[in-house]
Amino acid sequence: MKKRNWRLVLRRVLNLVFSRIVVTGVLLLLQAFWLFALFYWLADYAKWFGGVGIAMSVIMCLALIRQDSTVPEFKISWMILFSVMPVQGGILYLLWGDKRPALGLRHRLERAEDAMAPARKDDPDAAAALQRQDPRAALTARYLHDYGPMPVCGGTAAKYYPDGQSMFADMLPALQGAQHSIYVESFIIGMGEMWGQIHEILRQKAAAGLDVRVIYDDAGCLSLLPHNYAEMMRTDGIRAFSFNRCVPVLNLVMNNRDHRKIMVIDGQIAFTGGVNLADEYINKIVRFGYWKDSGVRLEGPGAASLANIFLTFWKAKYPDEDLDAGCDLPAAVPMETDCLVQPFADSPVDREAVAKNVYLELINQAQQRLYICTPYLILDNDLLSCLRLAAKRGVDVRIYTPGVPDKPTIYQLTRSYFPHLLRAGVKIYSYTPGFLHAKTWLVDDRIAAVGTVNLDYRSLYLHFENSVLIYGGAVLDDVRRDLAEIEKESAAVTLADCRTGFFGTLYSAVLRLVAPLC
């Protein structure tokens, strides 16, 4: 018995040591050590490289200044690095200065966008209805139409979910009722009850001849799924791939993650929001207390827009694969509804920060109330200034953040912004029962945003994201009630709560300096 136990322990240790995440981490550390050794060697020859380093720093600084689409925080962080380490900073910038995906991926995504453009059907009646209903919101919708690029959709019923478990309960019958296709895209897929039930339905539907496709992010699932999980799904008839495979090479392209969460059934029903496909998101397992999330269900033409986003990604992966928009995106049946919706996607491929610009629009058009749920609050100057100004002009601005952190360093960084906001009159609440993962906005009880976008640099500049704007309708009452419940279970943050002492303040300042570079 003891011998068998030792073998079991040894097998587990070997599996851990040679696991993909450990091997990748070790190789990355070795490359970091090599870079450090190179920089140390360059320091010994500073007198030979000094002039070259200064010239390189000047060129890099001028190049940064010319980039009008680059946020000032990003420029400042790099310029400080150039000043401290002229030669080394220039090398690092050449390696990691461009936050966009690799050139090949950019070109494939751009071609896929063009290929899927004919399937994005405008709804002139919905656009006209929004113009009559809310002219200011119609301007935001026009921006999204041109740069999202996604139209406003009428005839789309929307249902809001205040947690992952209620959303999951509706996912299962929708999946079981699929007749044509199922598309699933998720940042995280974790083995357990949630994914187990979904996967079994997908397997059955694929066996019945339906078009079943799955996209998952490789980094998000690095420690959760076997490295060949996409191949394993393909043996079940499920077409699948992992996005942006993690390789043990130090480059910023690995930061471009697919953070989207989309499920589309028959092009008619769609789910999206903050909920990944793992058990903590439906509170079957406890990680950081109660996991508070949000999501939305669309039925009608708005679901087809999310299918378009999914298939654009698919087309980028398989550019030579024929994609008949009329077949793969059947016309959605309009539903009786009292709201308009506008799903949209954001991508680091271009230099258009769509999600950030939409959020700036929502802040600037708020007249009475602006309520925001976000798990992370790492703001650039544009967002920080707009939130402060909104509070100063009399808008009731409330921000709900987690009381229990999932990442202590990010939690510290989030709280470093609290004093600036509180002094301007913004109210901040800390959700005490657990981790608040919802990404929900409510503006004047007339517009809501529900999706995957966090208020941090990674979501706004590095990740592939998606969200839905909901204009009017009774569904906004459900959003408002959920936010009221969150506030009841939260503690109001005061300036006294934000005192960290000299070293805490210094630590936060360093974190804010490096945040744009990560």
Indicate residue ranges for each PLM-predicted region:
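Glycine- and other small-residue-rich loops at beta-strand/loop junctions that grip anionic moieties
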Residues: 187, 376, 410
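Active-site donor-binding acidic/aromatic loop of nucleotide-activated sugar
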Residues: 428-432
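N-terminal localization/anchoring segments of enzymes in phospholipid and broader phosphate metabolism
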Residues: 1-357, 361, 365, 405, ...
